[in-house]
Structures are given as structure tokens and as C-alpha cells.
Amino acid sequence: MNLQPITDLLKALNSGNTTTIQQAEQLYADYKNHQPDQLVNSFIVLIRTSQDELLRSYPPVLLRTLVNGNDSGNILKGLKPETLVTLKTELMFAVREEPKNHIRHSILNVIAILAIQLVPEQKWPEILSFIIESSSSPEENLRESSFYLIGAIIDDSRVAETLAPHFDKFALLVEKGLNDPSAKVQVSALETVSTFIDANPEKAEVFKPLIPAMLNTIQKTIESNLEKEAQKGILTFIIIAQYHSDWFKTNFDMIFKVFFQFLEHQSLEDETKHACLHFFLTFAEFKSSIMKKKLYLEPIVLLLLKWMSSVEDMDLKDWNSLDTEPSDDDDSNVAFEAIEALSHCVSKGLWEFFLQCAPTLLNSGNWKERYTGLMTLSSISEGCEKQIKTNFKLIIQSILPLANDSHPRVRFAFFYCLGSFASYLKREMQDLYKTLIPVSLEHLNDPFPRVTISNCEFLTLFLDEIKPNRVKEFKDQFLGRLSPLLQNENYKIVQHSLNAFSSVVDGIGEEFTQHYSEIMPFLIKILRTQTSVETKTLRGRAIETISLVGLAVGKKVFLNDCIQIIQYVSSLEKFKDDDPQVDFFLRAFTRFAQCLGEDFIPYLKYSMSPLMDAINGKVDSSVENGEDFSDESNNSGSIVMENKAMALEMVSIYAMELKHHLFPYVEQLYKGSIELVDFPFSSLVAIQAVNLIPFLVKISKQHFEAVGGLKDGMKAEFTSRLFLDSYERMAASIKTESEPDTLSAKLKALSDLMDIGGQCEQADRILSLTFEVANESFGTLQELETEYQENIDEEDEDADESPEREIIDDAYNSLAMVLGEVCIQFKEKAVPYIATVLPAMIELIETAPSVEIKTSMICILDDLIENGGQKAFELYPHIIKPMMNCTLPNLDPSLIQSAVFGIGLAAENGKDYFTPFLMESLQLINNVIVSVNSVQEQDDDLIAARDNAISAMGRIITNLPQHLGNNFPQTIALWLSYLPIQDDGEAGSIIKSLCTLIRDFSQQIMTQQYIVKVLEIIAVGLHKKAVNPDDKQIISLALRSQESLVAQSLFQLSAENQAILANFFKN
């Protein structure tokens, strides 16, 4: 074989000369397309025989792309059978004989890619024999290569499925590798275990007995000073902790001793120690019942506190110049994040132990320990929120003296800690405003800017959503202390004090008008003059404050300045997509719109252009391709994505404020946002795009009604087309969505679209699509639920529910909104479709692990009963019993509330269809009322459950009186004895039921026995504004007909109720 042409080709590709490389690439393409067999055979010969390292190393790299099944240049199927046989055979020989490690690994990569395509099709049985033989080779490199190959090929799902019956044989092979005399081979064998777990977690169970040998391997590598190899082994343990934490139950004591010893080892690399810590954190997440034991938790927490206390003792001048605390991956910062992670897994045990350590830390003579105490409180403030609340005032009292600490980094940590509390314990913090605001104000003039900035950040968080009267109480002090900071020569102080100042203005509101003329020129000056790269954020804060001041003082005061600011900003050169100012300016313009209302419409063009730019901003290609990229490009890509999400959110606000005036931009906005509903790099971008879509359809509908003169804007061709396209694309997107929070947003958007579209002309198409989505969503949510349940540590009775629980519940609720909206819009036409998913709904009502899911499913039944007509009533035998089973007094009050409400609706709407369930339902409802009334301390949920039960009883009595027979009088007496109710939500239903009885059964109701109770119920209903005009007429006629009885009974009412009725009679 003449190898010269291929040799010349390879040398040309490596020449470094652009022209030569381009010519060589064209020649290479010709070989691929027209002479693939010659190309492959030549590569094989060079790999096997060339003495030139370059000519041996380059062919495997090119072969990898030539045979890659995912590559468009794949030539595998075009090769002659004999070429393929040669390729397979010679590659295996090459691995055995290649002396250079990097070339051998390139050849192994080619074998792996080839095996991934051929093994599932049973076209390379020899490869398994090759792997097994290589694992017993006297050559260390070949033994290591065998395990590398196992890991590489088993990682493919098709190969894993094909080889699953042989996992037990692989386990024996791995066991052999773990006992190999070579540490390199041992670690390679250990690493394959994680690949088997990834490929098939259930079948991987055969590797569980190897845990002691795996741990022994890691120990040996540490003893042999092979830390990089040890780190690979620890990573495998982390993966096992994620997927199979149960594997460690019997061996955890041994694992803990080994890994904790590594943590304490002073001479080990940080990467090794941090990997061990990562293992403990992962294990705590999935097996908190073990990790929370004092034997394990307390030594780790003590070590972490020690690490945190090792914070760098840097020069205060240098520290003061930093934007944030030092964030290197040193022990101190790693410990801070680790304690935060632990607080979410073992909050109770962590808090109890920290309480023992806290006094020593907070009162230490060493500033680093005081700093550690405060920073630890900050890091656990979210995870231990429940525990902190029970000790909150005591905690604040214990740390308050540290506001005056002699060391500035402790004072910094004090305000940093308060800021964390303000984020996660907002109500508790704001209730202490009389204590905390003066402390903050007193220290706003700290000589160290970092402390002042930390204080300002705390104030900003603390004042968020605070009651305005609490801010107004300190208005003069706030303005007096913050105003000088706005003039500070340190732009960072100005920037953060502006943020706090904005929060103060937001709280003061219209009362800030008297200060408007003082502050607005100053803010405008910052906007116009602070144009350097360093002060971009300051400038952003300035326009943010301007917009918040505008909202506070109102359009009349702000209008002229607002218009001038809009015109000035619009004259500026366009910001780059990744400019941090974009966020501030776009949000400010949205507030301008909120302040000016329709007066903003002439300036809408100025804000829509940058919004569209942000929505369409290009994400760095390295992000899109999932490549490694620099911190700079990472930050740039993040800013672009944040701006996309923010711009989409802002357009939604414009839509709410300006409604049909936004119509000229609908088509362009729709085109930009619909492409982002499946945005793969940021769920927030996808969710905001999804949220915007229904608004755009609604704007179009409003436009054709307000401007086009149509009674129903949905009948406009443009709106109809927009609606159907968005519905179809949203439905298609939902079918492939697997993230619960994004799925929830998409389902809610589908519900909103249906609400806007109503009973559109494409009803059959919409119904068909909706139930395709519903069936798919039930399946997806069940998979997510199963995955969630598998990760719960059932042995930990103290475990808090993870955030995933709420996310899944929200997704079910969004699905319920879709199905409920179907019932509301399509009424009887929807019932046959609902019947197809009814078994899934009933199963969830009966077996779902979450009250919220059960309640969501009952809500669908409520909408079905209320809107489905006779076809829905015919389903009563299937749906009433499950609701009745949810009324047992020992169940969650919110579930009972939804169930009794549904039963009342069923009686009211279905009447005769409800008869078979009548007496049992009444008994169950009465049991609910009696049970709640027996509880001495009733919370809002219990009261709502009881009052809904009382309301349901009234619906049953008034709609099925003839079916109660002899029980009718005593049932009325019982119902009246439970009235009036406290829950405002059911007051209207109670009045409606009472008025029905007054109208139809006056002789039984308007009697000496009940008149006082009737008058009391009416007075309460009037006070709650729950009496509609028709009911008022019924009441008026009834009371006039019994004028003397009413007059005799009024004095038995409270003075308040007498006054209410007197006013009613007067009017």
C-alpha cells in the first residue's frame, strides 16, 4: 500500500500554513467521500507501523470523527465489510502494542465509539473478550485500558441495555481490578462503578458489596501520594451517594472515619479535602437520618467552624477596597457554603449543636471567631429558618452588641447577618424595626466603607415590602443619614446608599414630594455625568432611584422630568447586550410607564427598541455549544440571559399597564418570545417567555375590540391565528418538558390562553390538543413524583420537605387549572374528555403523597360539577365517594375544606343525582363541624374547613329538602345552631341558603324559635357585604311580614347587629 499520499496529507494538515491546510482539508474531504476504505486502511497501517510519533498520533484523532455515529462525516456504513473487520482487529492489536500513553488513549477512544455503534447490533462480540483478556494482562497499561473501555462504552444507554444481563460478570471484573497491584488500575476499576450506576441504577446493585474494597483503594492511593487518583475515587463515592445512598448504610462508620481523617489531614491538597466534604454533604442530602447523628454531624460542624475561623487576616486597607469578601476556594469560604448546605439537610441537629457553640464564638476575644459566629448564622438563616424563629428575639439580643465591635470585619459580618435574616425571616425582622432601624442609622457613618456598604445592603433588604408607617416613623432620620452618603466621594458608597435610599422612598411614598426638588437634580446629574466603565452600576442605581421617586410622588410632580429623562436616555448610544446598565434602564422605563399610564404611549417606541434588543440578544456561542469558556465570556453570557428574562418580564408589565396600546409590537414580540419557550440555557428565560405569550394574545383581542370595533376580538383573523399558533406550540412544548417549574409555567400559560380564547371556533382542535397534553403531563409528573419519593430519607422523622415538593405540587396545580378551564369554557362538551383522565385524577385523590395534589384534583371535580351539566352528574358514582373520603376529621384541614366544598356543589348542581349520597354526606359534614368545634385553639385552616362544611350543609338542605323527609326540621335546627360563620369567603353562600329557606319554608324558619338566630345571620351577612340585591329583597319582605316578631326580638341582638339592621330597615 502506498502510504505517501496520506502521509503528505497528515503533514499538510499539521503544517500551520493556512493555505496548505485549506488545500489539505479539501483533499481529506475527497478521500472521505470517494475513497473511505483507502483512508481507513492507510490510517490503520500508520498507527500500527509508523516510527514517527506524529503519524501515529494524528490518525486516531481523525478516525474518531470518521466513525462517530453522531457526526455528519461518519463513513462507517460506507466501509467494505473487510475494511471494518480489519479496523476492529487492528485497533485491538494497536492498544496492546502502542508504547505512548496519549496515543493509546486516542486509540481507545476510537474503539469505544466503534463499540457504542456495533455492540447493540451484536456486530462486535470480540470486544468483550478483548476487555476481559486485557484485564488479566501482565501489562499495567493494558489492564488500566480495559477498565477505561468498560466505562467509555457502558456510558451509552443502548450498550448498557445490551450488556445489562452481564453486570454481575463486570462486577467480578471490577472486584479483580480493585485488588490489582497497580494503584492506577485500581482507581480505573473504581471509576467504572459510577458509570454503571449512571447507565442502570437498578442493575448496578451488584457492585454494592465492593464498597469496602473501593474505600481501601482510595486509602492506598493517599498512602502512595497519588492524590489525583484518590480524588477520582472520592468522586465515585459522591456519585454513589447521589444514586444509591443506601449502599453506605452498613459501612458508613468506616467511610466516615477514613474520609474525616482526610479532612483533618493538614498536608493533603485542598481538592482532596474538599472532595471528602462534598461527599458528606451529598450523603447528608440523601441520607439525613444517618448524617444527623451526633457521632457524625458534630465533628464535621466543629471542623467547618474551625475552617471558617481561618479566614485570611489581610490588611484592612486592602480588605476595605474589595467589592465582596475574598471568594477563593480556601477552607474558610468552602466551610461557609458547606454549613449552608448542611442547614438544608439536617437543620434541627445543626441548629441544636450550633446553639452550644454560638456563645463561645460570639463572645470570643478573637475577632475571627466572632466573625465566624455571625457568618454561620447568616449561612444557616434559610435552612434553619424554622428553628431560628423560635429563638429569634434572643438571637438578635445576643448579636446586637457586635454592631459596635472593635474590628470592622466583625461589624461587616453583623450587617451581613442581618441582611440574611431580612431575606429569610422578613416578618420577624420587621417586627423589631424599632430596635434595628436605629442601630442601622447609627452606623451609616462607619469609617470603613465596606461596613457602610454592608449596612446599606441590609437596609435595602429590610425595607422591602415593609409597612409604610414603619418607614415614615423614621423618615427624617433616614433622609438625614442617607443624604450625606449620596454626596460621598466613594462611588461604591453612593451606589449602595442610593439602593437603600430607593427603598426608603418606596416606603415614604407621596410624602417624599416635599423633598423632590432637592434630590431629583442630583440624580439626573449622576445619570448624565457618571459614564465611566467603573460607575456603570452607579448610573443604573441612579435611574432606578429616579423611577422609584417618580412612582412615589406621582405623575403630576414627575411628568416633566420624566419626559426629559426619557428623551435623554433615548438619545444615548445603544448599550451592548451584556452591559449591566441594561437591566436598570429597562426596569426604570417600566416604572415610568406605570407612573405615567397612557401619557407614556408616545414614548413607548423608546423603550420597546431596547427591550426587543434584549429579547433577541445573542448568547455567546461557547455557552450555546456547551464548551468550556472563560469567566469573562461566562459572565457576559449570564448577563445576556438575565437581560432576556428581565426584558420578557418587563413587556408583561407593559401589557398589564398599557393593554391594547402595545398592539403595534405584538407580532414582533411574539416572534421573539415564542422561540424562547424552549430556551435550553436558562429556565428563567423560558418561563418569562411562556408567561408573556398569553398577554400578547390578550392584547390582540383587546385591540380589535377597542379599535377594530369587534364585539369579540378573538374573531379577528390575526388574533385567531395568533391564538391557535401559540396554543399548538405551547402544547407541543409541554409534551417534551421535563423540568417541573417550567412545565408548571407552560401549563398555566395554556390555561390562560384558553381563558382568553374562550369557546373558539377551533374547539375540537383545542380539546384534542389539551387532553394530549394532559395525558402526557400526568405521566411526566408521576415520573417526577417517583424520582422525588426515591430521594426521600424515610428514616429521618425530622426531615423538612425539600423545595422540589412545592415545585411538583405547583405543576399539578397548573395542570388542574388547565382541566378546570376546559370545564368552564366547553361545559358538557368537555365531560367525555375529562372522563378519559378521571381514573388518574381519582387515583391521585386517593393515593397522592401530597395534600396539595389531592386538593388540586378535587378542584377539577368542582369545575366539572359546576359546568358539566347532566353528563357530569352521571359521573357522580365515580367522583362523590373519593371526595367523601377526604372529609375525615384526622385529615389536613385544607383537604377537608376542598372536599366539603365539592360535596356542597354536587348537591346544589346535581340534586337528584346526589340523593344516594345524601345522608352519609350530611353525617360526614357534621362530623367535620363537631370535630373542629371541639378544638380549643382553632387556626385559620380549621375555621375555613368548618365554615365550608357549614356552607355545604346549607346547600344540601336548600337543594334537597324533599329527600330529607322527617329529618328536614332537625337538620335545619342543626344548621342554624352552627351559624353565623367567621369565614368571609362562604358568607354569601350562607345568606343564599338562608334566603332560600326564608322564601320557601317561611313557616318553619320565621318563628319564635329561630327569629333571633335568623336576624343575627342577616346582620353578619350585611356587615360582610355578602347580601346581593335579590337576597335583600327576600329578607326585606320576610322581615316586614313578621314585623312584630322582629321588633320583639331585636333587643336580644348585640348593639352592633342592632345598628346594622336598623340601617338596613332605614334604607
UniProtKB/Swiss-Prot annotation:
<dbReference type="InterPro" id="IPR016024">
    <property type="entry name" value="ARM-type_fold"/>
</dbReference>
<feature type="repeat" description="HEAT 6">
    <location>
        <begin position="206"/>
        <end position="243"/>
    </location>
</feature>
<dbReference type="InterPro" id="IPR000357">
    <property type="entry name" value="HEAT"/>
</dbReference>
<feature type="repeat" description="HEAT 16">
    <location>
        <begin position="661"/>
        <end position="703"/>
    </location>
</feature>
<feature type="repeat" description="HEAT 10">
    <location>
        <begin position="385"/>
        <end position="425"/>
    </location>
</feature>
<feature type="repeat" description="HEAT 17">
    <location>
        <begin position="718"/>
        <end position="757"/>
    </location>
</feature>
<dbReference type="InterPro" id="IPR040122">
    <property type="entry name" value="Importin_beta"/>
</dbReference>
<dbReference type="Pfam" id="PF18808">
    <property type="entry name" value="Importin_rep_4"/>
</dbReference>
<feature type="repeat" description="HEAT 12">
    <location>
        <begin position="468"/>
        <end position="508"/>
    </location>
</feature>
<feature type="repeat" description="HEAT 9">
    <location>
        <begin position="349"/>
        <end position="381"/>
    </location>
</feature>
<feature type="repeat" description="HEAT 1">
    <location>
        <begin position="3"/>
        <end position="34"/>
    </location>
</feature>
<feature type="repeat" description="HEAT 2">
    <location>
        <begin position="42"/>
        <end position="75"/>
    </location>
</feature>
<keyword id="KW-0653">Protein transport</keyword>
<comment type="similarity">
    <text>Belongs to the importin beta family. Importin beta-3 subfamily.</text>
</comment>
<keyword id="KW-0539">Nucleus</keyword>
<comment type="function">
    <text>Functions in nuclear protein import as nuclear transport receptor. Serves as receptor for nuclear localization signals (NLS) in cargo substrates.</text>
</comment>
<feature type="repeat" description="HEAT 21">
    <location>
        <begin position="917"/>
        <end position="960"/>
    </location>
</feature>
<dbReference type="GO" id="GO:0006606">
    <property type="term" value="P:protein import into nucleus"/>
</dbReference>
<feature type="repeat" description="HEAT 13">
    <location>
        <begin position="510"/>
        <end position="553"/>
    </location>
</feature>
<feature type="repeat" description="HEAT 5">
    <location>
        <begin position="164"/>
        <end position="197"/>
    </location>
</feature>
<feature type="repeat" description="HEAT 19">
    <location>
        <begin position="832"/>
        <end position="869"/>
    </location>
</feature>
<dbReference type="GO" id="GO:0005737">
    <property type="term" value="C:cytoplasm"/>
</dbReference>
<dbReference type="GO" id="GO:0008139">
    <property type="term" value="F:nuclear localization sequence binding"/>
</dbReference>
<feature type="repeat" description="HEAT 24">
    <location>
        <begin position="1041"/>
        <end position="1064"/>
    </location>
</feature>
<keyword id="KW-0963">Cytoplasm</keyword>
<feature type="repeat" description="HEAT 4">
    <location>
        <begin position="125"/>
        <end position="152"/>
    </location>
</feature>
<dbReference type="GO" id="GO:0005634">
    <property type="term" value="C:nucleus"/>
</dbReference>
<dbReference type="Pfam" id="PF02985">
    <property type="entry name" value="HEAT"/>
</dbReference>
<feature type="repeat" description="HEAT 8">
    <location>
        <begin position="295"/>
        <end position="347"/>
    </location>
</feature>
<feature type="repeat" description="HEAT 11">
    <location>
        <begin position="427"/>
        <end position="466"/>
    </location>
</feature>
<feature type="repeat" description="HEAT 22">
    <location>
        <begin position="969"/>
        <end position="999"/>
    </location>
</feature>
<dbReference type="InterPro" id="IPR011989">
    <property type="entry name" value="ARM-like"/>
</dbReference>
<feature type="repeat" description="HEAT 15">
    <location>
        <begin position="598"/>
        <end position="658"/>
    </location>
</feature>
<feature type="repeat" description="HEAT 20">
    <location>
        <begin position="876"/>
        <end position="909"/>
    </location>
</feature>
<feature type="repeat" description="HEAT 23">
    <location>
        <begin position="1008"/>
        <end position="1040"/>
    </location>
</feature>
<keyword id="KW-0813">Transport</keyword>
<feature type="repeat" description="HEAT 14">
    <location>
        <begin position="555"/>
        <end position="596"/>
    </location>
</feature>
<feature type="repeat" description="HEAT 18">
    <location>
        <begin position="763"/>
        <end position="826"/>
    </location>
</feature>
<protein>
    <recommendedName>
        <fullName>Probable importin-5 homolog</fullName>
    </recommendedName>
</protein>
<keyword id="KW-0677">Repeat</keyword>
<dbReference type="InterPro" id="IPR041653">
    <property type="entry name" value="Importin_rep_4"/>
</dbReference>
<feature type="repeat" description="HEAT 7">
    <location>
        <begin position="251"/>
        <end position="286"/>
    </location>
</feature>
